[in-house]
Amino acid sequence: IPTIFVLGQDFSTEDYYNRILDGGIRDTDCPTWVNLLKLFKQAEIDLCDCFFSNAFIGLRKTTSMTGRFPGYKDVHFVNRNLQYLNFQIQIMKPSLIITLGKHAANMLYRLSQDDLHAWKNYNALRLPDEGYKEKVRIGNVCSSCVALEHPSMRYANLRRRAYKQYTGNDAELAMLGDALSCFAT
């Protein structure tokens, strides 16, 4: 079982998904995957140790791949997705949960409001030294959590990241390094 749970917001649009199925494009060529694979290589994260999921199940019926998932407006839909996310975490018992972007971080915050209280209102990405948390309780699971900028917008947003004495890409690499060393020992 993978030890790292990587949480995005959603998969994409129906059109994008259908183009992948038709062989017109490869998902790994999109900015999200290109930038994520580069970061994970820098952080020495083995993809075989990772399970990739999304906070929201389903595809967008819109043309835009970015921004808040349209289903966010439906409280019942959000709650069902939170239940499913919690179920996945309880089954996997990951040592590390990595969120991609503010919306995924906000969904994880909703499962552990006491331990991730600083992540409320998307502060996991805004405030210095708040993107990495150890010993986060989610149900019966205790994990380290790292909130990363969404890979598709990574280079536009990295300037705001700060952790310890590091900024930008170095800050996110330091958070990942601390999280990995925390459960490697």
Whereabouts are the PLM-identified features?
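Surface-exposed cleft-lining segments at the edges of enzyme active sites
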Residues: 14-28, 59-78
